[in-house]
Amino acid sequence: MKNIIKLLSICLVCGVCSCSDLTFGDKFLGSQPESSGAVLDSMFSSKVNADKVLTSAYTYLPYGLPTGAAPNNKLGVNLLEAISDLYQSFRNNASDGPTNLYYNGLLSANNSLANAEAYRYGSESQYNAIRYAWIYIENVAKVPDMTEDERNERIAEAKMIIALSYAEMFRYVGGVCWIDHSIEPNETMEFPRLTFAETADKIVGLLNEAIPYLKWKQDEIEDGRMTKAGAMGLKLRILLFAASPTFNSDIKWHSQADEYTCYGNYSKKRWEDAMKAGQEFFAELDKRQEYALTQPAEPTAQARRLAYRAGYYDRGGTEVLVSIRRGYNESTHNNLFDQRFYSGPTLNYVNMFPWADGEDFPENFNWEHPSKQPFFENGEPTRDPRLYENVAVPGDRYFNDTQAPVYTNHQDYRAEGSGFLMMKFILQAASDRQNRPVQWPYLRLPEVLLSYAEAINEVEGPENALSYVNQVRNRVGLSDLPSNIGQSDLREAILRERALEFGFEEVRWFDLVRWGRKDDFRKKLYGLYSKGDKVNNPTSFTFAPYELTLRYWANNWDSKWYMAPIPQKEINKGYGMTQNPGW
């Protein structure tokens, strides 16, 4: 945090910030901006210059996929799902976070690897985003060529950037040290940690301040900027997280849990607040339209898969509410492509996906003697279309339009793996990625639908919640859930639906945490051996499940893992941060 404070202070001493950080394709304040004597008045002398400060704030927003040397690559250029039950890392190198810190239980407040943790408080980029946003808010009044409406909208964008940045911290560590202004060099560096409740309230407060001034949806030119729909959706996400049982309970989630990491009691009103946020979102959606689930062009498995793909992959559509960008073309994701063979989805995840008609896939499916083909029958998919878009399964095409190397007699098969590969964002062929600008779909409309359904179910029961879940299912051709489903069964159905819809979108980890799903952290994980009837372009397979290497958590589970440890050296700096339970 003192590094963060130092950055905030230096930016004012040396002309607000390193102006080279603000150069996007053209020279901002000369060829040697750090020594040019640039000051606040220069940086806010025009709308164009001021926008570069706000753009810098945008560039520090979280991006869930590895992107080159970006400072917030997590888990050693791996994915958050690799420490959930959906995905397993097999990368035996020294920098891999899952294998070196999580699967063996070695992560601690004093033991870490650079960029190998899921989240390292004080070393992430959120405070950079906050820094630039506050500088913008405090100085944009100096800009002479902006209308009042333009100024208010840009300030609202900056406030949402701050709220989103704190929201990321909140989900990983609970209460945070809150900076609500740009820091003066001679300011006393004391920022006491806020409680869990205070942090949630402040995030929601910033969003409430931003919502009235944001556009509901941006036009094509401004696409990627923050919107009212995104702010309202993020508000629901935070309220739902805070209302969930891990934090909203009379029973503490850990013996050392305190006011910084939970409420310490149960209140139904927290669920009601989440439900109200959902009501407000859908009331606005009914009035303004413009957002909707991307629908298939025809009622076929391939069309449904492509509609689902467009919903998460494509910029400027009707589904992504918060889009974060790190680059334009597919090369932005080269690190992901390069590492695609060294981790794999678990059979546990694959088994969550129902048959194509919506019927549950059997828990006791006989893989050695299947009564029905589990992936393809005469070339036609037999399962939920989202399975194939999230997971490369035996018989599908992969990356460069060749057979996915996931069956044992494929010439490129790797013995260290799960028998599956990640498909999402990687896709089947180069043509799928060409001329298709990339993004991180930080928040999508299906999450708002399912979050609202969850809140309704917890407050009122299933009846009024079902239609929101069924919208998500119907888009990919699945049948409605039973109309007589009970509250607990619907709760499970929603959590599963979220796993299916948001694979590799950083949703599953937080769902497991907020619902205290210790059994999912401890359960055995499986892979699947598949052998094709021929080496090239097989049309049928034989199968055999196998156990993946047990993680430390299986026999040594501790709920401390629900929140990240605070590095001890951060606490020792004495500005106000405290340790999380169990660490």
What spans do the regions from the language model cover?
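Bacterial Sec-dependent N-terminal signal peptides
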Residues: 1-31
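Long, intrinsically disordered, low-complexity segments
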Residues: 18-22, 126, 202, 296-354, ...
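An aromatic- and glycine-enriched ligand-binding surface/loop that stacks and positions planar moieties
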Residues: 20-100, 176, 208-209, 225-232, ...
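Conserved, well-structured interaction surfaces
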Residues: 39-55, 59-70, 93-173, 187-223, ...
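Extended glycan-interaction surfaces of carbohydrate-active proteins
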Residues: 207-210, 393-436, 519, 564, ...
